[in-house]
């Protein structure tokens, strides 16, 4: 375990707190709390923008920001409900971070959407004369910092944007924020797996307690030797 991961370990009291609302009502998370924590979805950075302050659970003594798992779970539900309103084939997901390539590809396979992994070709959403021009109804980005070209184009033509945002994110032009560790390999796999499953639940393609045929591990980008 890295120093960063050690710094985000939670006490039993904190774990109990994260499974209840501020009024003390027990929350049923989309996956068990320990599953979220072991994937590191709550691990932030040493920087926090004012846009992300409302999603912070605590700040470690060394200055590392830790995200509130309850709010991650809540925003995954909000995003899934929002995305489910659009035609499956009109959902475009992009990722320029290598660790996000497999999660995005598997996610798009499950929800039957389109995806662009790697470099986002300029004009994809704005230049109808290009062969690769597409007209999605909603855009999902893995990281506003690295997927900026896609965000600029979507905002220019009025496409709503859903984004995974870490503590250091700027959220200009983002319509639906999912606060989360959008850099970690295991975190990205779990986030996209949960989002895919919840979208199918919202579409009523699977029961409210149903699962998808792929495992979280199937969404994980493999490390090269």
UniProtKB/Swiss-Prot annotation:
It holds the Pfam family Ribosomal_S2. InterPro entries: Ribosomal_uS2, Ribosomal_uS2_arc, Ribosomal_uS2_CS, Ribosomal_uS2_euk/arc, Ribosomal_uS2_flav_dom_sf. One of its GO terms (molecular function) is structural constituent of ribosome. CDD domains: RPS2. One of its GO terms (biological process) is translation. Keywords: Ribonucleoprotein, Ribosomal protein. It comes from the Archaea. GO terms for cellular component: small ribosomal subunit. Belongs to the universal ribosomal protein uS2 family. NCBIfam families: uS2_euk_arch. This is Small ribosomal subunit protein uS2.
């Amino acid at each position: 375990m890295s120093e960063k991961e050690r710094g985000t370990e939670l006490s039993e009291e904190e774990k109990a707190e994260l499974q209840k609302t501020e009024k003390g009502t027990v929350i049923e998370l989309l996956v068990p709390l320990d599953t979220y924590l072991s994937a590191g979805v709550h691990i932030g950075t040493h920087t926090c923008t004012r846009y992300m302050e409302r999603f912070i659970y605590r700040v470690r003594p060394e200055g590392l920001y830790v995200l509130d798992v309850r709010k991650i779970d809540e925003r995954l539900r909000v995003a899934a409900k929002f995305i489910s309103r659009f035609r499956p084939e009109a959902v475009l997901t992009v990722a320029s971070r290598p660790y996000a390539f497999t999660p995005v590809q598997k996610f798009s396979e499950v929800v039957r959407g389109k995806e662009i992994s790697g470099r986002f070709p300029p004009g994809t959403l704005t230049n109808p004369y290009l062969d690769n021009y597409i007209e999605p109804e909603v855009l999902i980005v893995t990281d506003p910092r690295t997927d900026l070209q896609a965000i600029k184009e979507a905002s220019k033509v009025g496409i709503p944007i859903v984004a995974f945002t870490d503590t250091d994110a700027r959220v200009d032009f983002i319509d639906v924020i999912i606060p989360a560790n959008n850099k970690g390999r295991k975190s990205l796999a779990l986030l996209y797996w949960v989002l895919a499953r919840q979208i199918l639940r919202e579409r009523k393609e699977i029961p409210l307690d149903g699962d998808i045929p792929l495992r979280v591990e199937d969404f994980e980008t493999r490390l090269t030797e």
